[in-house]
Amino acid sequence: MKYTPSAILLASLLLTNTLAAQEKYPKKKKNRCTVCEHDPELMEANKMNHGPFIFARTDSQKIMDDMVWSPVWMETQHYRLGGDFPKWKIPEVERKIYRAELTELQKKFPKIKPKTRTLDKWYRLHMLANRMEIFYSEARASFGCSPLEFLDESKNIRRGLGPFLGEKDKYEVMVFEETNLYREFMTLNWGLAYVKPQRWNNVDRDCLWFGLSLQQEEIKHDRKLQNIVLHGLSHNLLDGYMHYSFELPVWLTEGYAHWVERTNDPRFTTFCSVEGSLHEGKTLNDWRPEVRKLIKKDEAATFAALIRRASFAEINWEDHLVCWSKLDFLLQTKPKEFGEFLTELVSRRDSKGYPDGSKMDDAQRNGFKKHFDWTLNQAEKKWGEWALNTYPAK
Ligand SMILES: [Zn+2]
């Protein structure tokens, strides 16, 4: 991985500017955050700010100037997030969930009104950022990674890793309301006129980016946005773990992303297809009976078959369900072993010490034996029995 001196210089200059800008309150009250009021002490205490900051190819201010666009921005401990968050009226049935979430967040930001029935852009931004930070801790735990793992700077340098699970800079998320604006950003920044949700490896700063358009994905519901962001971040955090240097097995990464999304809210599902883009598939809230049927008919893809699938093109609708279930099984019954298995897989190095993604099927087979003490056939049997005993028939 190349990290040119000029890039480091640019990064540090921009960070210095950020610090200067943070000290100011926005002059106009209408631009002031309704959650933290841009209060420097409150922002500092909660390890967040509303920019400007370095982002994507340039920085948040330049993006707004170039595109004549006024999103809201937020930087937290592990993320930089920006975008449009249209006002959202909380549906009657969801009020309880949101009130509980807001009551919790009020402990950090006293100005929050937990009984509010409409979330403005600042509420939505702060709530999404909060959910993303919670997810970061959850993901790190699932990966079998200690919160202290990347805090030792000299150890990071020795291993050639950065502080963000192995990446050098924070994970980035961008949410556009309009498809056209999203396309314009994609063209300007990454040189691709894509409009589907996209993950991007920003090699200049060694960080992983994820973006989408609400209009394109027909996202109205706040939980649907939350789910699609968590799905994208599942991939990015997994990829970033011990540094993104080679591709992880597709069953593992897609299975994990589904597991995260479905654990958060099973009503909204995202499916990855080729080239890292995402698309929506059939709607089915409860996947468990469907997986049961596949096992009973002996039609579920086996571990032995799945470990060889190299691309999203080789994963059909039923495979998505099976991948999810296999992760559900491993994370629920063998969380510690799963973390060790995954950590070994992402940490592979060749004889010269370089990241090694070769012979991934052998590595997985050996990993199953070493960490779970199962051959792939044994793993298959264990999973099938567990799913039949655990999942409802209807
Ligand atoms: Zn705020």
Predicted regions and their residues:
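Positively charged n-region of N-terminal signal peptides that target proteins for export
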Residues: 1-5
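Boundary at the C-terminal end of the N-terminal hydrophobic targeting segment
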Residues: 19-23
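Short low-complexity stretches enriched in small and charged residues
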Residues: 27-42, 126-128, 212-217, 280-286
